[in-house]
């Protein structure tokens, strides 16, 4: 049955597990066990916040291990969950990390990146609250440049009206704006470790604060461009940076969600001839242990505790098994959920049912050219057939196969749509077969291997 948007009664503890599942059903087909597991985990967070006294700190999240092939919805479930709750969400592949002491990123950068996301989220929220005031201040600065600070109130009011009406958008002015050139080269890059930077020692921030943040430069620009630069500048001045950082750290610590993908790739399979690789993979697992169990990570914003961050790990486990992970790591991922491979019926539902289904997306895109695209039921079934066939014969990449199928199917229409204004195009099973049969005949075609 098609999921529809529902209005829920206000619950002081947020959405109930069944409501969370209903919300996820709007975007994701099937995988009820996984949805149920994340819904319970989310509700338990709300429950924990209402527990009184010291017991609250002892209640830790039950981290989740999702097992399933690529493209079955593992990442999408976690991403939608974070969006639903406005939680800071960070996704990373486990293969990006190496053991501390080896070349590569260390696992603590996960928390530094999560906090960065939380800070940006809080800043954006704070800026929306001061947007009107910031816009007024920006207009005043532009008026100073246009008519001078000593101009009469009548003159300023007249030019202000012109700015608001957009009459002066293309007028060039000379105005002082903040110098955004990085001081000291930004974050300190660790030699021999590409992509790794010291979260605590950010030389750019330290030198910038020491010199003061009032460094400006005069530039010539159009009024509309000046507005785009000055409004964020004024917003920065109006918001309480220290308060935002504290709120962001609290948000990351209590509501943060970390999604570690491809965790099966760092499992030790016991294969011979790869001893160094085995050591490195096991080292990454050991580095993850304190992070998932609960530790304090130093960031440039201050120390961050990971005790109540929800960790969701996932992997296909085609070669390795969950039992190949270190026993200690298995113990820190107590909720284990297996996601089902997608069937033909699932593919049909994915094409049609979600609020942002692929069929709706492509129809909307082509619709911008004043071309009405319609898919017959027979076409949907045929597309699902082809997706399942290619997944079985080449490599199972789940629902992601539908993207490739549809791109090939609609390639000519997408190319010619601008010349077809006012037309209605019906995609039926014969059209699908004509477009895809030759490609499907050769299943080794590189364009079908994503």
Swiss-Prot record:
Main location: cytoplasm
Keyword Methyltransferase carried by entry: no
Entry's localization field: Cytoplasm
Binding-site positions, ATP: 29, 71-76, 261, 328, 400
Stored Pfam families: AAA_2 (PF07724), MCM (PF00493)
Keywords: ATP-binding, Chaperone, Cytoplasm, Nucleotide-binding
Alphabetized NCBIfam families for the sequence: hslU, PRK05201.1
Name of the protein: ATP-dependent protease ATPase subunit HslU
Protein species of origin: Rickettsia conorii (strain ATCC VR-613 / Malish 7)
């Amino acid at each position: 049955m098609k999921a529809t948007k529902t209005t829920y009664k206000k619950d002081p503890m947020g959405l109930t597990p069944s409501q969370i599942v209903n919300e996820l059903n709007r975007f994701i087909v099937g995988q009820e066990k996984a949805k149920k597991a994340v819904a319970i985990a989310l509700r338990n967070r709300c429950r924990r916040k209402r527990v009184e006294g010291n017991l609250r700190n002892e209640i830790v999240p039950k981290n989740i291990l999702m097992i399933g092939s690529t493209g079955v919805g593992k990442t999408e479930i976690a991403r939608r969950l974070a969006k639903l709750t406005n939680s800071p969400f960070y996704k990373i592949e486990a293969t990006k990390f190496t053991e501390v002491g080896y070349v590569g990123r260390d696992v603590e950068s996960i928390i530094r990146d999560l906090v960065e996301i939380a800070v940006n989220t809080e800043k954006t929220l704070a800026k929306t609250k001061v947007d009107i005031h910031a816009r007024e201040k920006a207009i005043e600065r532009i008026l100073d440049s246009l008519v001078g600070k000593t101009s009469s109130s009548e003159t300023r009011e007249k030019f202000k009206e012109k700015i608001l009406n957009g009459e002066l958008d293309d007028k060039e002015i000379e105005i002082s704006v903040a110098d955004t050139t990085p001081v000291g080269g930004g974050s300190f890059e660790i030699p021999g470790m590409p992509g790794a930077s010291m979260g605590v020692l950010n030389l750019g921030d330290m030198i910038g604060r020491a010199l003061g943040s009032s460094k400006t430069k005069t530039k010539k620009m159009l009024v509309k461009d000046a507005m785009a630069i000055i409004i964020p500048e004024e917003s920065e001045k109006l918001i309480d940076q220290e308060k935002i950082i504290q709120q962001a750290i609290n948000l990351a610590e209590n509501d943060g969600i970390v999604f570690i993908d491809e965790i099966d790739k760092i499992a030790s399979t016991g294969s011979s001839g790869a001893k160094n690789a085995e050591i490195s993979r096991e080292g990454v697992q050991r580095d993850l242990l304190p992070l998932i169990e609960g530790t304090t990570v130093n960031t440039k914003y201050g120390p961050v505790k990971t005790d109540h961050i929800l960790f969701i790990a996932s992997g296909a486990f085609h070669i390795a098994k969950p039992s190949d992970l270190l026993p200690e790591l298995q113990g820190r991922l107590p909720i284990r959920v297996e996601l089902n491979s997608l069937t033909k019926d699932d593919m049909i539902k994915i094409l049609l049912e979600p609020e942002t289904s692929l069929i709706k997306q492509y129809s909307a895109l082509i619709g911008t050219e004043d071309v009405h695209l319609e898919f017959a039921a027979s076409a949907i079934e045929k597309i699902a057939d082809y997706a399942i066939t290619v997944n079985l014969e080449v490599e199972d990449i789940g629902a992601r196969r539908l993207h490739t199928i549809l791109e090939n199917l609609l390639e000519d229409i997408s190319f010619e749509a601008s010349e077809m204004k006012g037309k209605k195009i019906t995609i039926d099973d014969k059209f699908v077969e004509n477009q895809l049969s030759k490609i499907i005949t050769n299943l080794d075609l590189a364009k079908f291997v994503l």
